[in-house]
């Protein structure tokens, strides 16, 4: 069960990079529909479209890196549930 969850999480993360690279407009629309808050959408856009590291995103948003990880994980879990 845990192994399946990790694999699903990793595959979603991997394909988000590919989608963001090939179809940036589609990625923006997907994040707009999936993310409840503007902050979640901003984090995902910075991570996948602008290819920023979590530490750089945390500095830009003036928050802790763990908070960025938590929000990122929540959004990916929402995508998995779709």
Model-derived features: positions:
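Short helix-capping/turn signature of helix-turn-helix
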Residues: 45-52
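Hydrophobic residues on short alpha-helical segments
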Residues: 44-45, 76
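DNA-recognition helix of helix-turn-helix
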Residues: 61-82
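Short helix-coil-helix linker/hinge
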Residues: 33-41
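Hydrophobic positions on the alpha-helical face of helix-turn-helix-like DNA-binding modules
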Residues: 43-44, 57-58
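Short, solvent-exposed positions on alpha-helices
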Residues: 41-42, 66
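N-terminal interaction/assembly modules
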Residues: 1-33, 55-56, 62, 81
């Amino acid at each position: 069960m845990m192994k399946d969850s990790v694999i699903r999480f990793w595959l979603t993360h991997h394909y988000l990079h590919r989608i963001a690279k090939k179809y940036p407009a589609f990625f923006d629309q997907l994040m707009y529909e999936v993310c409840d808050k503007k902050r979640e959408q901003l984090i995902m856009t910075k991570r996948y479209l602008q290819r920023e590291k979590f530490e750089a995103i945390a500095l830009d948003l003036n928050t802790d890196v763990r908070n960025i990880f938590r929000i990122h994980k929540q959004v990916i879990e929402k995508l998995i549930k779709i």
